[in-house]
Structure formats: structure tokens, C-alpha cells
Amino acid sequence: MGLRVAALYDVHANLPALEAVLAEVEDAGVDLVVFGGDLVWGPWPGETLDCAEALGERACFLRGNCETLLLDGLSERHRWARDRLRPEQRTRAAAWPLTLSLDVDGLGSTLFCHATPRSADEILTPASSEERWADALAATEERVLVCGHTHLQFDREVGGVRVVNPGSVGAPTRRPAAWWAVLGPEVELRATDYDTEGAIAAASARVPDVRPFARWLRDTPSDDERLADFEAAT
């Protein structure tokens, strides 16, 4: 019998959002929690990783594009977040894999990655062409793929592969909430409400500039707006 898995992607160090989701995860009866990348870049880097790692062996971690940017310290915001991870946390984050394959109850062999199986920063959305999807999935043996990166929650089939994006826990699309998914035996797309204004107030006391974080939660783009931005960039 396969596993029942919670997929938590793009937390972006939004600790209040993660705590709200984990309270529901405990009631969901899952065997594993997969953190699908872009976990530690945001207002609460070290605290967010501590919270996730408190799950012990039930937690699995993937490296997203923001982990690479953060650890490389390519911008002031990335360096700020990096410096709020303890050295041993940075070492562990640098070692997170890019992909993970699990046997999920009812779904079978399922591949988890941050963006696509071949890249942690490739942009593919529901509006992307079948040809682009087929090219990105050409080497994928699994018939179910769980990916994030775009913060767009969806469940679709492309060329015989079921593609699930759980959405973003910490930087939402559609409405201010924490978006995630449970897999096994079905795919359950979920959204958890929490006190977003309280999160902004708490973040303002610790980050140099709270405005980007506040925009994530107050000026939440629609799916169409996010799609238009991504497709214009590809």
C-alpha cells in the first residue's frame, strides 16, 4: 500500500501560514510531508525550517530556485535570509535533492520536483503549450508529477502524465490563504485560511522592508494575472 502525502510548496518562510497548514496536516492522516522547495526565503527563514524539521522523519525536502539564490547570496534580500539560517541549516538546505519519487496510495509512482523534473526555475503553467510540457516531461517515467514554482494551484493531464501543482503556502494566488494538497488515494487541493494581517504585522517587526511580503498577502493576483505575467516572460 502506498503513502498518503501532504505537498507543501513555496512556503517562502511565511511561518504563520505554515503553522496554520500543519495544524490541518495533523488531522489529514498523512504519512509524509513533502516540502517542495522555496521554503526558507522570506520573513522567518530559520524559524520556518525549524518548524518543518520538527516533523522528523515524516518530512522530506526539495531544493527550489530560491534556496540556490539564497545560499549564493546574490541580492541583499537573499543575503538577509541566508544570514538568518544557522550554518548547519544552510548545509542541510544545500544538500536537498531536486527530485523525489514516492509510491503514493492510489496514484502509484509519483515524482516530486520544484518546477520541472529538469530544472528548479523553468516556468510551465496550465496555459503553456502541450509541446513545451511534453519536452519538459520527456524523461519522466512516473505517470504523476507534483510541481510548484508558479504558485498556481491546478490538476491537469499532459501527454499521459497527471500534473499537480499544490499552489503556494506562503505567497498565494487567487485569494489570501495558504494553498497546499494531499495526495492519496485521490488528489485533494486545499486552501487554509489564517490571519494574514497578523502575519504582515509580525513580519514588519523583523524584516528590513515588509512591503514585498505585504503585497503577497494583500494584492493577491488572480490566476489570470499570474498566468499573463508568466507567459509574457517565456
Regions flagged by a language model, labelled:
Residues 1-6, 101-111, 158-162, 186-187:
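Beta-strand-turn-beta hairpins that frame and shape the catalytic cleft
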Residues 75-79, 106-140:
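Active-site-proximal segments of metal-dependent phosphoesterases and phosphodiesterases across multiple
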Residues 12-17, 41-44, 66-72, 120, ...:
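Active-site environment of divalent metal-dependent phosphoester hydrolases
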Residues 157-234:
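Acidic, His/Gly-rich catalytic cores of divalent-metal-dependent hydrolytic chemistry
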